[in-house]
Amino acid sequence: MAHTNDTIADMLTRIRNATMARHESVAVPATRMTRSIARVLHEEGFVSDWKEEGEGIHAQLVLRLKYKGKGRKPIINGLKRVSRPGLRVYCNHKELPRVLGGIGIAIISTSNGIMTDRDARKQGIGGEVLCYVY
């Protein structure tokens, strides 16, 4: 497994590649951040299930991807990294972006943990805009 500085971008790329190849599941390195993002993706219905395998530095999250219909169209149409190590993006609760008019979600890292833009707006808190999922 290659060592990467941006685990979130790595996770999003792995999910994007797996959905385009119509894979049943995808393994991503387990970190506190990727666990939280996997939890949000599961709560929002973008992945059907996720579990952790292995332990310590070799721990991996296995996400079961969702498809719809006979043509097995992916539920996840796009993933976009917003804030990155070279250019952080922060928003207060009034500036939080709406993804595709509310169809997609923005995943925000707040002082209350990682949550969707909808939850952050409801709680009246802003934070770092990690990525868009639609």
Curated annotation (Swiss-Prot):
UniProt GO molecular function: rRNA binding; structural constituent of ribosome
Pfam families for the chain: Ribosomal_S8
GO biological process, one term: translation
Keywords per UniProt: Ribonucleoprotein, Ribosomal protein, RNA-binding, rRNA-binding
Matching InterPro entries: Ribosomal_uS8, Ribosomal_uS8_CS, Ribosomal_uS8_sf
Domain of life: Bacteria
Annotated SUPFAM superfamilies: Ribosomal protein S8
GO cellular component: ribonucleoprotein complex; ribosome
PANTHER family reported in the protein's UniProt record: 40S RIBOSOMAL PROTEIN S15A
Quaternary structure (record): Part of the 30S ribosomal subunit. Contacts proteins S5 and S12.
Family per similarity comment: Belongs to the universal ribosomal protein uS8 family.
Role: One of the primary rRNA binding proteins, it binds directly to 16S rRNA central domain where it helps coordinate assembly of the platform of the 30S subunit.
Protein name: Small ribosomal subunit protein uS8
Organism: Synechococcus sp. (strain JA-3-3Ab)
Gene of this entry: rpsH
